[in-house]
């Protein structure tokens, strides 16, 4: 059963890709579904890239990254140090926008402090050309 949710998918930013895409998310069986054939998610076909998904009533977007040929990760883009937003990956590194020097790997694990804990993660699965993310809507 397909349904749509009142959320916006911002799959890229002007800074990194030159355009921004906003659209309703597709939800199947309570999971966010991203089709890698769609232009707004196509950058996730490349290891090291990421997209942000704006979720209605959430302060910071959901961040999804391509970790390897067979793995993806999904997590909150809210830095665990001071609550600033974590930026899209550059050269496989996620940096906190605060300028405090905190960085994370493509799976949301702390690489450099001041953050002491990993980003809040959500189960994500790559099946063929689709990514499924179990996100706790509510």
Sequence positions of predicted segments:
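N-terminal pre-ligand scaffold of iron-sulfur
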Residues: 10-89, 121-138
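N-terminal export leaders
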Residues: 1-7
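Short cysteine/histidine-rich zinc-coordinating motifs and their immediately flanking basic loops
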Residues: 24, 89-94, 107-112
């Amino acid at each position: 059963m397909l349904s749509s949710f009142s959320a916006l998918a911002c799959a890229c930013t002007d800074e990194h890709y030159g355009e921004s895409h906003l659209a309703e998310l597709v939800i199947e069986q309570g999971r966010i579904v991203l089709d890698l054939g769609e232009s707004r998610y196509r950058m996730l076909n490349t290891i090291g890239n990421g997209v942000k998904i704006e979720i209605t009533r959430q302060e910071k977007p959901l961040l999804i990254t391509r970790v390897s040929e067979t793995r993806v990760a999904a997590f909150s883009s809210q830095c665990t140090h001071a609550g600033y937003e974590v930026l899209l990956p550059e050269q496989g590194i996620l940096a906190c926008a605060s300028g405090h020097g905190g960085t994370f790997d493509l799976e949301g694990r702390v690489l450099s402090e001041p953050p002491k804990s990993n980003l809040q993660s959500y189960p994500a699965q790559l099946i063929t050309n689709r990514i499924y993310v179990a996100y706790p809507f509510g």
